[in-house]
Amino acid sequence: ECETYEGLFNFYQDRRDGKSYLEIDTSHLNKEYIYFSYYENGVLEAGSVKGRFRGSKVIKITKFFNNIDITVENTKYFFDNESPLSNAAKTNINTPIIISEKIIAKNLNKTRFLINADNIFLNESFQQIKSSYKPGYKGFKMGNLSKSKTRYHEIRNYPENTDVIVNYTYENKYPSNRGGGAITDSRIISVLVQHSLIRMPKNNYKPRFDDTRIGYFTTQTNDMTTIDRVNYRDFINRWHLVKKDSSKDLSEPVQPIIWWIENTTPYELRNIIKDGVESWNIAFEAIGFKNAIVAKQMPDDATWNPADIRYNTIRWFIQPGSGYAVGPSRANPYNGELYDADIRIAADFVTSFYKEFDEYVVPVTEDEITQLWHNHDEQNHDAHGACNYSDHLKREMAYGWNQLLINGGLKGTEEDLKRYVHQGLVDLVLHEVGHTLGLRHNFKASSIYSVEQLSNKNFTERYGISGSVMDYHPVCLLDGGNTLFQTKPGPYDMWAIQYGYEQFNDDNLLENLENIASQSNHPLLVYGTDEDSFGTSSRGIDPLCNTWDMSSNPIEFYKDELNSVNYLWDNLLDKFEVPGGTYQKIRSVFSQGIGEYMYAGRSATKFIGGINFSRNHVGDFSQQSPFTVIEAKKQREALDFILVNYFDKDAFDFNPELLNKLAPERNEDFRDYVWNLDRPDYPIHSVVKRMQMYPLYSLYHPRRLARVKDNEIKNNTTDVFRMEELFTKVNDVIWQELELKENINSYKRELQIMHISMLSNILYNTDSMPADAVAFARSSLSEILKNIYLSMANNNVDYYTKSHQEYCSKLIETILDPKIQIN
């Protein structure tokens, strides 16, 4: 009466009512297995993003009288068997029974047992799915699990793994927060989760210790029996790669890392993906492995499924409107051995490039500046192994293509397009395969070459554009369109692979690894990852550890970028206002330039109060301090860049003809774009306000101001960038019209109101602000008010300016005088 799914754990499902059973036999008892789960689909606001890992742990199956128990083993602590302390290994360390199910049937020999699978998988026995909410949380919340609506989505069984995909449904009849547009009905949320039970790998794999100077994902363990100052015993996550013949300088591995390109992949892209995968062999050949990585094509009539963990696959799937691509891998929780990986690439990463891109600039709300500033714990960037390279890269590719068409770098031929897509897709595949080899992001790698070097096509052809494929690279337009992407492993990648995979004798392993890692201060091997960068957040201290930047002088790169954007805007109509074209295309390309402008402004602020951070250890090559304050002249260059391009009275001046041709798409789509668009005309003031808002709030963020103050006494030179200089320069440029006795344009009027609001926030948030910042905020407001009074006596300004100045003066008066504020 049951559908049978044979595999690692046999699974049975009643054809009549769907009730399911899991078979445990004596071969399973008293053995350890790996449990792994991730979101197959979900809703961002519910914390369930597609592809996000839920966790990996070791479970043990035992029989207790008439029950089958599943316990979770604690893998976080190591006890050396030679130490007497190992006798207390289980003391105060929890190994809980998370599942205990009554045996409901057994065979005559009592070697096979059936238990209720519904009680295991149709609830949260293995893993908590619903998020926990802190007291006072007012965001979107999932309701209670609905037993009647939670059901199996798919069951897949293979010799090495059993996968159970469950559609969990949560109900909240009266939600206080209804969430965003992706939530169809806020009362009911469905989340798709895959549970995997996996056979524990058994081989002679030898784990390798982690070193913080090199970026690998790790399996964390603490050695409880060591007397060393630091008891971390973390292992890097890597594949079991061993030479067939260790006596040869170059040998094939016993078992190569094989990637299967799924048969859903378009024919014209298969060789591109193969190129991206096998380009990693450059790094492996340098350490003696021939054909360490092999890419094969999955046959159209293949009898195996990509979900079978015996096959590493690059999967091509449909996710409309997304440039999603991710390269997750799975590691043994005991030792970090990688045993399975799947790279998923959304078809829209390539297909959307051929279309007119959505605009991704939205108007700013009036109170957003205050909300952003008060949010001192700005959103982490790519925390805990997540990767959003592909979604941003598709936008960069769109902008880069249009820029090259306008500046003549490419002619737009079919051959140009093929070459462009080839390079971009190889770049993406290299990045995602790098993750599956165990490598983390390296957001400092793009800083190793100068603008001059990157502008030389002979140099970029030979060396590429970056030190690593694990950075987030913009399309590099500096050499005129010759080398646009990073299409081969860089020097950092070669070094990291050497540390993780070069084969050594056990006797000198640790010495050899230390010799490799101690080269971390070499200029070509710089490394900084997610928790060093934090995107553009004020938590990131190193301006060279950044995403979507380029060169050893990012400010010079940003200047070139903004010049290119302005050139694009100036020539946009000449290139794209052609018969048969659409005004939506013009609007989209214009918005792509806005996106570049926004990111440059916010990223440049990292130089203010910035600190170069090195992960080196004492005694490393070219010994240097971990922290080096950014020299004052570089901080001034960055501040001047922001002032001139974002806050100056001449910073923004758009062609009215262009603005009147930025028409949106009028065809309806599945997202109701036409109906949800707030304004069909282009909201230029709101967009400019957003461009100015991000660098403004970032400059005045409590963390940044605290670092500026601290750096004043950490600097070893007489030339010091001081908080006084920051406040004075920003004040002078934002309020420059008062000195010049000129009219204040509409963009500047909005900026000045934001500036007053920002200074007010500093003044009345004394707990989080340095005392000097509070004092400077008050003196700034007083000085601005005095200059407004002087300017109001000038009768040569327009009515807009007079009204604005009167409003600003009253606003500042209420801020400075508590009695007025109370009244």
Language-model segments: what does each one mean?
Residues 297-317, 422-479:
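The catalytic-center signature of Zn2+-dependent metalloproteases
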Residues 15-16, 52, 230, 263, ...:
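Soluble non-cytosolic domains of exported or imported proteins
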Residues 278-289, 319, 434-435, 439, ...:
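Sec-exported extracytoplasmic/periplasmic mature domains
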Residues 257-295, 431, 435:
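Secondary-structure-rich domain cores
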Residues 37-39, 276-277, 357-360, 449-454, ...:
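Short secondary-structure boundary/capping segments
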Residues 1-265, 283, 287, 298-415, ...:
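Auxiliary tRNA-acceptor-end handling modules of aminoacyl-tRNA synthetases
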